Amino acid sequence: MTSNLVETLSRLPATPGITYRGWSGPAPHSAMTVSAVMPTSADPRVASENFTSERLAAIVTVSGRLIAPLSRHPDEQEIAILPDTLLLSVGTVAIPGLVNDVVLLAETGTAPGLPKDSAELRQVVAQQVTEALAKPAFPVHSPGRFSPPRGQANHGE
């Protein structure tokens, strides 16, 4: 089933952009390879289960697949990161209202519409997360889907 899922997702067009995932444990300080399909959301509030996750990771993806239109819950704005995707740790950004800094991860490569440098990435992430913090709570349809429980490994460790 897993190989069929990956094969099917691989056929979808890549959707470059910034996507988010709740994060458990310390911020990564090196590269990591995604070990399984990693669900993320274009909405930081969804990805962090209303900012209850230990941390939030912002991922600059070149190859992520937008699966929201195919999802049972399209309002989650899900973007799948495929297995074997290499994510580089490119820093953190402090956001007022969050206990821990947002972890910044990025695929190698470029695509139109992505931040041109780390300063622009920090600015865009700060704006998106600040806007999400101001929104009302989002109904969590699938607890743990976008944010592993505290102490549970992330998709690449």
Q: What are these model-predicted stretches?
A:
Residues 1-157:
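Mono-ADP-ribosyltransferase
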